[in-house]
């Protein structure tokens, strides 16, 4: 899921290095299952490969389903059920006490940005500039463009 990124936050609860452990890159299954979730903000399509989430999009959003393989099929799986449970908690105003495992096969930079977003505490936000600052620190660079972060966030399939 893409957190809102409009205000500064306090120190993150977990580092993006810790969040990286949640992001799996190895392929477990070639079968991708999808399901629909009716959220208060609109219909969400959830995709997973049996071991991890691979996509989560509001229907009709830009890049909707861009990472879905042609053979994706509607179905049920424990991964999709776990994502539904997380969304139920989130949209009911309760802090989920777990984070579904996600498979995010992308560039190293986009994975770092995703890890930083996962470190944003529940109910808080972070600016693209702050995410860029943290990503630059992780990459050993002096600075990084907030626009590059915006591109990474926009292409995040979850």
Label each residue range with its predicted role.
Residues 2-14, 19-98:
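Low-complexity, small/basic-enriched stretches
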Residues 32-43, 94-158:
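Nucleic acid-binding interface residues in structured DNA/RNA-binding domains
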